[in-house]
């Protein structure tokens, strides 16, 4: 990542995946709920629960409000999620454990809650979503192009999938948050010739 104040590119080693990412409350491992090496953790299925999530935002961009500006102002819907507990095997990991809520239908993560070594809630992630076929999900003004466009071909009509709209983390112990209003721009590749084993 290029850091303008240093006029340098900072390379991010995969070995520091549980360290703070560029001064934010995120780590490399935290993106999308979990973005690490599964074998470096023990996993437990906790159960299923219904939670309120932003599964289909009504806005083009994430709208924040509230006393700290951390809450997402949008349409919330009830979704059934499976909850898994992630327990790091390495004692030097900053979290004692983390719960990840995964949508039963789409497989998308909406929330994650990390706890410190004392068992106190430390960080909460919220991932808001949009759908690929929403009218405002357009990158070039001419039509959606989410990486599936290959040689002028778009994904078959009716291919509808979720994209993240924001990745937000609230550090409850330090009373701060990192809000990342962004949009996922990649989609499953529909070209079977490019599929690798």
Residue ranges of each PLM-predicted region?
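Gly/Pro-enriched, hydrophobic low-complexity segments
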Residues: 1-36, 69-184
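C-terminal amphipathic alpha-helical segment
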Residues: 33-75, 80-82
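Long, C-terminal catalytic modules of enzymes
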Residues: 181-197
